[in-house]
């Protein structure tokens, strides 16, 4: 297995979920940079290069996954088609609206690693 030359930015505030997703990505050849909030994600996106972004829909600090995607669309359009959302709240009206607006794929928690990695490979490319 070869490694991607660029890391995936993982935005997830739940430590157990972050560890699970990070391990799944790394085992599949994707290096990972983790952060716990949308605010931190924006800071990292301003100065870093990433293969793509995996973001929880709900993150602390006043900037959620949808707002991270909106920022990416404005400031890093090269990444706009390489965002994957993860959420345990797929039926929430705000989540549904964000998914409709962005067109980004979403994997509902809890999920199987194989299901998640299939979405990642389709969205970010296989490594």
Description of each model-found segment:
Residues 43, 64-79:
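Short amphipathic alpha-helix used as the core "switch/output" element in two-component signaling
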Residues 63-67, 80, 84-108, 114, ...:
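Alpha4 helix (beta4-alpha4-beta5 surface) of REC/receiver domains from two-component response regulators
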Residues 3-6:
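Phosphate-coordination loops involved in phosphoryl transfer and adenosine-cofactor binding
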Residues 12:
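Conserved acidic carboxylate
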Residues 19-27:
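Charged docking surfaces used in two-component/phosphorelay signaling
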Residues 15, 36-40, 114:
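Acidic phosphotransfer microenvironment of two-component signaling modules
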Residues 9, 22, 34-52, 60, ...:
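Acidic, metal-coordinating helix/loop segments flanking the phosphotransfer/catalytic sites
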Residues 121-127:
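The C-terminal output helix
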